[in-house]
A protein has these predicted regions:
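Hydrophobic/aromatic ligand-binding patch that stacks against planar heteroaromatic rings
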Residues: 38, 122, 164
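Rossmann-like adenosine-cofactor binding region
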Residues: 65-161
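Glycine-rich phosphate/diphosphate-binding loop of Rossmann-like nucleotide-binding domains
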Residues: 11-93, 99
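Short helix/strand-capping connector loops at secondary-structure junctions
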Residues: 161-171
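Short, small-residue-biased leader/transition segments that mark boundaries at the very start
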Residues: 1-2
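Short, structured coil segments at secondary-structure junctions
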Residues: 42, 126-128, 167-169
Length: 171
């Protein structure tokens, strides 16, 4: 997923070095960590935009800061959606609950991460040139079995990204 995402970004922008990639959501696990490592080694500016509870492990952040220093990139952790997404080239998210985690974590994640949902306003703040990426599968509507179940259970029509963004030209 990471290699494919980086190839997509390079194809779209013609480069990777110097671009700003913002990961919104739970940045403690595979996608957030892998994107942070990749961006730091490729000279990109990685931003984890989430509540502090979901920031990446401090040791990994320190290692990635060293990689970024050598490559010309940077690592930023922020809870501020406006600040974090401003002038971003790439807005990236993933499902809020990883494979193998119990259903009980949904309530907590939805509560904690709803402010970090990728919306039209987030993309507008990033700018017209910004693109949206998702590792997939995405819960952006109620058309899947799990999407429908979560919608009924939590009275939601989407989770980590709105259907409007997921189906947009920026996606």
């Amino acid at each position: 997923c990471i290699r494919d995402s980086m190839l997509t970004v390079r194809e779209h922008f013609g480069k990777l070095k110097g671009l700003k990639l913002v990961y919104m959501g739970d940045a403690r696990y595979n996608m957030g960590n892998s994107l942070m490592v990749a961006c730091s080694k490729l000279g990109m500016h990685f931003v984890a935009c989430t509540t502090k509870k979901y920031f990446p492990n401090a040791e990994l952040v320190a290692q990635c800061e060293e990689y970024a220093k050598a490559s010309g990139g940077s690592i930023t952790l922020t809870e501020d959606v406006q600040e974090g997404t401003k002038d971003a080239d790439v807005i990236y998210t993933d499902v809020w609950v990883s494979m193998g985690e119990p259903d009980e974590v949904w309530t907590e994640r939805i509560h904690d991460l709803t402010p970090y949902k990728v919306t039209k306003d987030v993309m507008k703040n990033a700018g017209e040139k910004a693109i949206f990426l998702h590792c997939l599968p995405a819960f952006h509507d109620l058309k899947t079995k799990i999407g429908k179940e979560m919608g009924e259970r939590f009275n939601l029509t989407d989770k980590e990204v709105t259907d409007e963004v997921f189906e947009s030209e920026q996606s």
